[in-house]
Every structure is written in C-alpha cells, then in structure tokens.
Swiss-Prot record:
SMART domains xref list: GIYc
Name this polypeptide is given: UvrABC system protein C
One Pfam family from the record: UVR
Source organism (scientific name): Enterococcus faecalis (strain ATCC 700802 / V583)
Example of a GO cellular component annotation carried by this entry: excinuclease repair complex
Gene behind this protein: uvrC
Keyword entries, A-Z: Cytoplasm, DNA damage, DNA excision, DNA repair, Excision nuclease, SOS response
Cystine residue pairs: none
InterPro entries: GIY-YIG_endonuc, GIY-YIG_endonuc_sf, GIY-YIG_UvrC_Cho, RuvA_2-like, UVR_dom, UVR_dom_sf, UvrABC_protein_C, UvrC
C-alpha cells in the first residue's frame, strides 16, 4: 500500500457511495458500492483475503470515490460506472446472448417478424423463445393460420406468399380492414396463451367441412390442429396464470456466485440463463449488481413479474426494474425460486468439480510426477525431439509445459546446422547446447525438468552437454516408446532406470501429452521445411528465375502443383517476362515427363 492510498483511506466518509479502484496506469480495474464507504474501502487493505481478492488488491495503485444520497442511488451509479468503464475485475455479462421474440409490427397492415431486440416502437413483442428454431416454428404455424402481409407497401402485384395462401397482399388488393384487424387480434390471443380457443374453432371448421363432404378442407384443418399441438406441447407448463415472469435464484461458495434465471412465458418454462462469476463484496450486494446489469447490458425483456430470494433487498430491485418484484413465501412461486437456487448450487458444485479435475490433470499430475521421480514438482518442463528422413532437412523442436499446460508462445524450432547425415545424438548435442547457452546468456528461466523423446544415448548426450559444457544441473529424463510408437517408459536417474508409473495415472497421461506434442511440433516443422526445399529445388537452374521471382510465384500460386498446371499466359500474368515464363513452363513439363518415364 503506497502513501497516496494511506492518505486517502484516512479521509474516507462514512456515507454511501461508489469507489473506483485504479492500477498504476490509471485504468479503472474495479468498481464497487458501499453503504459506508469508509468501512468497505478500508477492508481491502486490512487482514487476509482469498487469492482472487489478493490479486485485485495487488494491482490497486489509487482509488476514487463518489458519495451518493442513498444505497439505491449507489447501486444505480455502480451499474452505470461498470457499463461505462468495463473494469476487468467486475462482474461483466460479456455473453451477448439474446433470445428471439415474435414481433407484431406497428404499421397500417402489421407484419409478423422474429427479432432479438425489444425496441420502444409501439410494436407488440411475445417471448422470449428458447432459440430461433422455436420462434421460427411458431411463426410458420401462424403464417399458415393467419395470412398477414409479407410484401412491401410498394408491391402492387401479388407476391409469392399470396399464391401460397400466406399473404393477403393488402397493397395489391382491397382488403377489409376489419378482417385484417381480427386476424391480428387472434394472433395476439394465440401468443398470449389462447391457442386452445383457436384449436376449438378449427375443430368446428373441420367437423363442418367433413359434414359437407369437403374432405380436403377438413384434412387441412386437421393438419393445422396437429401443428398447434406439436408446437405447444414441446414446452412444459409451470403455472396456470399465464403471466410472464423471470425467476432468480443464487448460490455462493469459495468467493464465487452462480445466478440462475428461469424464463417463464405464458405459464411455460422456456429457458434458463446461468452465470458464474467471482465476487468481492457482500453476496447480496453482488446479486443486486448482477440483476441490474442483466437487464441493462444484455437487453433482456423485462417481464410483468420478477421473483427473487427473500434475503435480497426488494426495494433496491424495484428501483432497478420498472416491474412487479415479488419475494414469494409459499406455494408454486416459492418452489420456483427454491428450484432456481438449487440449480445454482448444482452448477457451482459442477464448476468446482471441473476445476479439481483440471488441476488433477495439470498441476496435480506435475506434483505426482515429481514425487515419482523424487524431485521437486517440475512446474516448468521443456521437451525435445528430432525429426529427419535419411538425414535430409534435419530439425529439432522444443515444447514447454508450465503447470502441466502447454505454453505455446515459448515453443522453439531448430534447424540443425553442424550435423551431416542422420545422427540423432549429434543433433541433440547441438540443440541442447544452443538452447541452454542462450538461457544462460539472456538470463531466461531454467526448466525444472528436461524430457528427451528418445532413449539412453540421447539422454546421456543431453546430460553431458549440460554438466560438462555449460556447467548447469537440470534433471534430464528420457521418454521411450513401444513398437506402436506410443509412450512406454520414463527413464531417469544416474543409470536411467524405469520410473514406475501407473498407465492410467494422470502423471503418465501428462507425459503422453508432452511426448505427442513435441513429436507433432517437430514433424510439422520438418514437413514444412522439406516442402519448402522441394519447391526451391524444382525451380532451381531455370534461366531468368531468381529468388525474388520464385517467392512471387509461390505467393501467387501457393504450391508447385499449381505452378506446374499454369499456362505460359498465366505465368506471364503472375509477373514473369514472357521468355522466363516459357522457360519455367518448359522446365517443369520436361521434368514431369522425365519423372514419369523413370
């Protein structure tokens, strides 16, 4: 804690407000609210905290605060400040997932549309639907039942949908406004839960058509009834009052919060939203911040009712939302809130289980590997592999694993410079010397363990370079493979003995991942180099074709195959003089012919 912070802490007021934590660059990294600023802000710099809070505090170089008249005013201000500054340590609802709605437009002849944005445009919105397929299904059904306008006002001739019976084309024909208005009212009724009335009317029409021998019409009405049943029975009923409501529940553990939101529309539970995030303040305060951001930043539709747990300040939620807020004490609504909270607890437990499993695969495996080898946990592991074909284009590659995870930005590729022919020992000697002489020279971190994809000979070479040429002491082990080219044994110690490892253990799986990764990286580099050299050799000794023109050809045609397939005119268009283009064409086609003859 610097002097500036100490001085400011002494001046903090005992009033409600917001505080803005800044890093050394003056960037706002966290925004919080407090009932008493003095107590809340000082708490960050006193006593012990969990790891994530300590990380936040370690970055604080300065802070500001804004005093407000009330706690609710502080809550509203906090949400606005978070939205404006996007602090990295705040609850940020970065998932821009929005759910689709069915919209009846506010026009002379309204249309049905699917949209993800609810605007203040005097249109009617119904939803949200769990996904766009559900919304499309419902809209297609309504298009069959009610032929609202699909065409533009400028359309003076019948559109395609008119011929399909799904558009009245009111701008091409005279349409009774009352007929159109009645259709819109029926759609509103359907989307508000009145589909049973429409089914009853269709049943009557089907019976009437059948009685009058109009069997095609009767079959059409029957299909429409089935379509309604199919669409409506896919969603589970949760309430009989058909009120749109969002149901909130939450759970906290180990400094993390999970909030679950159930979306209930026309009495149906259609979807849920799950958010898991760390929090630094009081849990109920963090929940209030979440609910404010939930509706403000993700543009969620605000329903007629919002149900919240009874330990949340209802007055604060009402200040955030212009809708009815309830804290049910009994009955079905109470069960829904409890169910949302139960699901939140389950989701949070699943997250921690996944973290534990991930740790077992990574840092846990590293610790167990260290125990098996009787060395400190090898937090940083560097692994090497050679690759060549009959000594051509020899390369080596190094991969780095930190805490059991690949650190790909630290991978390195090596072209072998001092070795002629297939000599893996000499290649390994060169690469180990190049790597660790540079580590010494530049003061880079040494690994805790070096793994060599190879047997005793290559490991001995690596150990000799480190001890006798560079004077460094780093544990070196070998990864041997079986006849199926799979990780078989870990060789370690003065006499390179087999380290006993269970084949289904996480430490063995870690070694497999490292060996597979270094092999992949080395062989990919070798193939790239071989392909590049092959390309260059095929274009060697062509009169007029220098390095620059070769490079331009590769850039233009991407491969030797494409260059060979190109005509003289295409080669000329790629920037070659006509004489050189003919030389290239003649050379490649002569070479192809001679290769076929062989």
């Amino acid at each position: 804690m610097n002097e500036r912070i100490k001085n400011k802490l002494a001046l903090l007021p005992d009033q409600p407000g917001c505080y803005l934590m800044k890093d050394k660059n003056g960037t706002i990294i966290y925004v919080g609210k407090a009932k008493i600023l003095k107590n809340r802000v000082r708490s960050y710099f006193r006593g012990s905290h969990d790891t994530k809070t300590e990380r936040l505090v370690s970055e604080i170089d300065d802070f500001e605060y804004i005093v407000t008249e009330s706690n609710i005013e502080a809550l509203l201000l906090e949400i606005n400040l978070i939205h404006k500054n996007n602090p990295k340590y705040n609850i940020m609802l970065k998932d821009d997932k929005t759910y689709p709605f069915i919209k009846i437009t506010n026009e002379k002849y309204p249309r049905l549309m699917i949209t993800r944005k609810v605007l203040k445009d005097k249109a009617l919105y119904f939803g949200p639907y769990p996904d766009v397929n559900a919304a499309n299904e419902t809209k297609k059904l309504l298009d069959r039942l009610f032929p609202l306008r699909k065409c533009n006002p400028s359309q003076k001739t019948p559109c395609l949908y008119y011929h399909l019976g799904q558009c009245l084309c009111p701008y091409a024909f005279d349409v009774d406004p009352q007929v159109y208005k009645d259709m819109v009212e029926e759609i509103k009724g359907f989307l508000s839960g009145g589909h049973t009335e429409i089914q009853d009317r269709l049943q009557e029409k089907m019976a009437y058509a059948a009685a009058h021998m109009e069997f095609e019409k009767a079959a059409e009405f029957r299909d429409q009834i089935k379509a309604i049943e199919t669409v409506m029975t896919r969603q589970k009923m949760t309430n009989v009052d058909l009120i749109d409501r969002d149901v909130f529940g939450y759970a906290v553990d180990k400094g993390w919060m999970c909030v679950q939101v159930f979306f209930v529309r026309q009495g149906k539970l259609i979807e849920r939203d799950v958010s898991i995030f760390p929090f630094y303040d009081d849990a109920s305060e963090a929940f209030l911040t979440f609910i404010g951001q939930f509706y403000q930043e993700n543009e969620h539709f605000v329903p007629k009712e919002v149900l919240i747990p009874d330990d949340i300040d209802k007055e604060s939620v009402e200040a955030l939302l212009a809708t009815k807020v309830l804290q049910p004490q009994r009955g079905e609504k109470k069960k829904l809130v409890k169910l949302a909270s139960k699901n939140a607890a389950v989701a949070l437990n699943e997250k921690f289980d996944l973290i534990v499993r991930k740790q077992e695969r990574t840092i846990g495996a590293v610790e167990k590997l260290g125990n098996a080898m009787n060395i400190p946990a090898p937090i940083r592991i560097e692994a090497f592999d050679n690759s060549n074909i009959m000594g051509t284009n020899p390369v080596s590659a190094m991969v780095v694993f930190i805490d059991g995870r690949p650190a790909k930005n630290e991978y390195r590729k090596y072209k072998i410079k001092t070795v002629q022919g297939p000599d893996d020992y000499a290649s390994m000697r060169e690469v180990i010397y190049r790597r660790y002489s540079r580590v010494l020279k530049e003061g880079l971190p040494f690994p805790d363990l070096i793994l060599i994809d190879g047997g005793k000979g290559q490991v001995d070479v690596a150990k000799d370079v480190l001890a006798n040429q560079l004077g460094v002491d780093i544990p070196v082990a070998g990864l041997a493979k079986n006849d199926k080219h799979k990780t078989s044994e870990l060789l370690f110690g003065p006499n390179l003995e087999v380290v006993p490892l269970e084949r289904n253990s996480q430490e063995f799986f870690l070694l497999q991942r490292i060996q597979d990764e270094v092999h992949r990286f080395a062989i990919t580099f070798h193939r790239q180099l071989r392909s590049k050299n092959s390309f260059a050799s095929k274009l060697d000794n062509i009169e007029g074709l220098g390095p620059k023109r070769k490079k331009n050809l590769l850039k233009e045609f991407k491969s030797l195959k494409n260059i060979t397939a190109a005509s003289v005119e295409e080669l000329r268009k790629a920037g070659l003089p006509e004489t050189v283009a003919k030389n290239v064409y003649r050379h490649l086609h002569q070479e192809t012919t001679s290769e076929i003859e062989k």
